């Protein structure tokens, strides 16, 4: 059975965020500021329909999708690229594959204990983040 990721989550830790941002081609100044942020993630889940808000003092990002249905994703607020995205359940992990200008790009969310985990990957760089309920 798929996990329930619903809730408001605050960043606890982040590993290799700069390497991931470099792979995305994000400029130096933005990378330095982004590393200092503690974003809050708000996930609304209704079955296989999701709305995810990632909010910080620098930028906010919003995505809405249904598991198993490819959609056009506009990454304005992140790296300003557009891609085709497909989100699937991989057991209790929610995994997104993003096809576009950058190769091997996507992310995976899952819950372990009382923590939300996120792995973001792009062109060989992997960023691992851990969130706790707000």
From Swiss-Prot:
Pfam families: Lipocalin (PF00061). One of its GO terms (cellular component) is cytosol. It is found in: Cytoplasm. InterPro entries: Calycin, Fatty_acid-bd, ILBP, Lipocln_cytosolic_FA-bd_dom. One of its GO terms (biological process) is fatty acid transport. One of its GO terms (molecular function) is retinol binding. It comes from the Eukaryota. Expressed primarily in kidney, heart and transverse colon. Detected in adult lymph node, appendix, ascending colon, and in fetal heart and spleen. Keywords: Cytoplasm, Retinol-binding, Transport, Vitamin A. Forms a beta-barrel structure that accommodates hydrophobic ligands in its interior. Belongs to the calycin superfamily. Fatty-acid binding protein (FABP) family. Intracellular transport of retinol. This is Retinoid-binding protein 7. It comes from Homo sapiens (Human). The gene is RBP7.
